[in-house]
Amino acid sequence: RLTLIFTGILCAFTIGAQQPKGLKKLRAAQVSVLAYTAGGELQQGQGTLISEDGIVVAQYDVMKGATRATVVDMAGNEHQVTEILGANGAYNIVRMRMEPGKKKNAYLTIAPQQPAEQAQVFIMPSEKADKNVPCTIDTVTHVEEFGDGFKYLTLTHEAGKRQANSPVLDQSGMLIGFVQMATKEGQPSYVIDANYANSLKVKAMDAGNSDLNSIHIRKALPETEEDAISFIFLTSKKDTAMYMDYVNRFIQLHPANTTGYTLKAEQEAELGQYAQAAATYETALKQEGTKADELHYSWSKVIYNLSMRPDYKQYDNWNLERALSEVQQAAAITPLPTYTMQQANCL
């Protein structure tokens, strides 16, 4: 109760103080985050748009365990969260993307420089606060560096509980970071660098990242083709829908990369979806830039492996003769020892 009274006094004090420029417009970048677990439990928090194309920074503990999530903007429009771009449970931060709306998204621009000790900062009210509520003014008492030159600020006062993850601005209205609450009540709050939040990305080895895997929403693939393929190879196939989602996304991003099609067709065949697998191979063979020999070889292996299974009920002409034909086409394009060995297997 004393904390609430103090916060109220502090807010009242800030009414007469100079606020960041264009505060009412800046508040349009604040959003509500509604995350739902597999059991239907609702977890709520606030987020901040940091780009025009829908990148949102939210609290990790709100997104943990979620199978789907919705972002509600200041106009009341709902946007589905389409992918997780990065996460860190220790710092309670998630970077994610929401689907675009009909209008351009309002967003906060990250400040080019972090404040020094004794600098004033402005904590925005929660996303649900009245539009006339001013920022809470606080002072930086300590600046600590972590990671790749990122800053972690200690404030003078404890922020209100509703301001957890609230954006923190400088006088010009640019984004410094996000409020983090102290572990003990009554202790000063902290600000984590917005640049750190924006740096969170999915890497090739993150298929086993427990923080990311605790959020059951598709992760963004790593930026390079090689890293994206490594990520998919390391991803568990237990969640078939998620695995296929990654493969389809890879094909969408890299339509000339043969591996995406072979991964898709092989998984479809493994699931008994033979017609779909055949269609995937046919599509890939028509796609400019793909390697036809690798596609024919993959198709041959799929048919051969199926033919070796006692429970396999032949689909169309998928037999050893067809498997041999496919690998012969591969060898005619590129005569590799691997293809010769596969021909011997099929005889």
What are these regions (language model features)?
Residues 19-20, 177-241, 248:
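C-terminal cap/linker of serine protease catalytic domains
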Residues 220-271, 311-313:
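Alpha-helical segment of the N-proximal tetratricopeptide repeat
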Residues 18-22, 104-152, 159-164, 179-190, ...:
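Flexible, gly/ser-rich surface segments that form the specificity/activation loops bordering the active-site cleft
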Residues 19, 36-53, 58-59, 78-80, ...:
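A conserved glycine-rich beta-strand in the N-terminal activation segment of trypsin-fold
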Residues 255, 289-291, 333-335:
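Short coil turns that delineate tetratricopeptide repeat
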Residues 266, 301, 308, 345-346:
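Residue-level recognition of tetratricopeptide repeat
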Residues 51-122, 127-133, 157-158:
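Conserved active-site neighborhood of the chymotrypsin/trypsin-like protease fold
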